[in-house]
Amino acid sequence: MTDPLIPAVLAFRANGTPFSPLYDDIYHSAVGGLEQAHYVFLRGNALPERWQERRVFTVVETGFGMGINFLVTWAAWRADSSRCERLHFVSTEKHPFTVDDLRKVYAATISDPEIAALAQALADAWPMLVPGTHRLEFEEGRVVLTLVFADAQDSVPALRLRADAFYLDGFAPARNPELWTSAIFKALARLAGEGATFATYSSAGDIKRALTQCGFEYRKVDGFGWKRAMLVGRFAPRWRVRRHEPPAPLVVDERHAVVIGTGLAGCAVIERLAARGWRVTSLERHAAVAQEASGNPAGVFHPMISRDDSVASRVTRTGFLYSLRHWAALERLGYGPSRGSKGLLQIAADDEEALSISQAIAAASYPSEYVTSVPADEAQRLAGMPLAHGGWFFPYGGWIDPASLCAAQCAAAGPLLERRFGVDVARIERAGGQWIVFDTAGQVVARAPVVIVASAHDAARIAGLQYAPTRSIRGQLTLLPAGTVRPPLELPVIGEGYAVPLANGATLTGATYELDDPDTSLRTDGHLENLARVAQMLPAFAGIVDRADPAALAGRVAFRCVTSDRMPMIGQLADETVAARDAQRLRGAWPLDLPRTDGLYGAFAYGSRGLVWAALGAELIASQLEGEPWPLERDLAEDIDPARFLLRALRQGTVS
């Protein structure tokens, strides 16, 4: 169970310095927060010199606080003509400020106009206060802030990245000892890249001993303001004792990737790679993008709520919030997909479920902008028609046209994307550091050092995977013409089924759930099933069921690709041949122990959650390729790792 997030309380000392009543300590020196950040952290880590001419540079901070260190680092990056191409700043925070308090503290403490403008941009992008990883992008994606709202004792060990510099900036060790433990420093040591440096305002003896024990060399230098001394140093272990090295970028002769499949999964990967300067060749067997499940007239998107905050809830929460930011960025570029803006209402199956989820929402202390419980009368007001029960409302949930999203992402990729349609991929082979892609006629259709298989049901076959238990689920939609639903539905309503009011006045309902059924034809009993399920949530639909001529109704059939655990397959694929050869040695393996196939990645089995998983999955794959910080916690990445089924088979001794 994830602990609820408790926001910071904004307070000021008599001299105007912001401080935390919880820790009874100040957020920065009374001499000046900007000056302290420059002196202690930039100068202490030899920045900006060390990031110059680098492609990617990653800073890891313990304790985001007001974000002053990030703002000063960002400003230094902007001012440096020799800056790195991409600056990552990763920070943890157990008690983040609300956006209103963040704006107040900036207004009260920042007078520098450049920093104030950056502070405004950060406040405008400030995420909802829910636990987990939040990735924010600035400067057209060249400055990336990854915030982890969680206790550092849990979040730092869950990071997966290669750090170039550490900002050790929690409250004083005497006030906040949990942030200065050997366990924290050991976790940081596992993240340190070659030549990684650190700086901290503290010079306490316990800190020096812990740093030394974890492989860091330190030296004492003059402190900032009234502090006599501070520590700076570097990661220089005497022995190589790490089981796994931090992630590194894939070394390729050319940054060129082939993406197989152009549904939600593939188009998201295309955009994320092109945003990093990769040339992409897309291969699609149909004549256009989004022709299978991604071609439905609309799809709904929302996070999951569960009493235990399950893995699925955590992944969908991260994916949902990342998707919202990603779509907003597309809209700012002029490539906005077609989507609704009134929110989404989820209806409980009965009063017991309504109470259970209401209690889960209250226990998690979720902000109302994320989700709120609504009784039946309030739910009815939101929906514009009577409802069977109350439920919960997602103000930023809703519907989106998947095909428009796919088109927007391809358009955003611009000239870096070469699109090829009518190509039915049969298999791939590795030779000479390149992947060679063959069609069903045996002809070579593409070559590249990287292939991302995003072709749903065909993905495991194309990639040659034996341990990828995917299945097909037939889903039939029913489309009610404009004027059928009276009064009209105001927003998407989901529960046992779903009903979505479309922009043209029609109402989309669905969907059936038929395992391993290949029939592509519309069925009258499927239409009746859809309408009957919706009528259980929305009694007004009962009359539609009675009046409907199912044979005359329009609809669509598509097929969802799912795994046995209903989680997606996202990330670098394992080398199953090597794993089989070393099966005995790998019987007690962990995900990072598994042999991986160079340059081969998967993005498939998204089921009915492609809208909340596709953008995050694409960002994860791009981050793995580039050796960048991952956009979600390592344990969650392992729960969607395509190699997880191979790992289970190895542990069970069934790989041969």
UniProtKB/Swiss-Prot annotation:
Question: What EC number(s) are associated with this protein in UniProt?
Answer: 2.1.1.61, 1.5.-.-
**What GO cellular component entries does it have?**
cytoplasm
Cross-referenced InterPro entries: FAD-dep_OxRdtase, FAD/NAD-bd_sf, MnmC-like_methylTransf, SAM-dependent_MTases_sf, tRNA_MAMT_biosynth_bifunc_MnmC, tRNA_MNMC2, tRNA_S-uridine_synth_MnmC_C
Instruction: List the GO molecular function terms.
Output: flavin adenine dinucleotide binding; oxidoreductase activity, acting on the CH-NH group of donors; tRNA (5-methylaminomethyl-2-thiouridylate)(34)-methyltransferase activity
- Segments carrying the region annotation (tRNA (mnm(5)s(2)U34)-methyltransferase) are 1-236
Tell me the domain of life: Bacteria
Signal peptide start-end: none
Annotated region (FAD-dependent cmnm(5)s(2)U34 oxidoreductase) at: 260-656
TM stretches of this protein = none
Required co-factors: FAD
Keywords carried by this UniProt record: Cytoplasm, FAD, Flavoprotein, Methyltransferase, Multifunctional enzyme, Oxidoreductase, S-adenosyl-L-methionine, Transferase, tRNA processing
Q: Which NCBIfam families match?
A: MnmC_Cterm, PRK01747.1-2, PRK01747.1-4, tRNA_MNMC2
Similarity-based family: In the N-terminal section; belongs to the methyltransferase superfamily. tRNA (mnm(5)s(2)U34)-methyltransferase family. In the C-terminal section; belongs to the DAO family.
Protein's name in the database: tRNA 5-methylaminomethyl-2-thiouridine biosynthesis bifunctional protein MnmC
| Species of provenance | Paraburkholderia xenovorans (strain LB400)
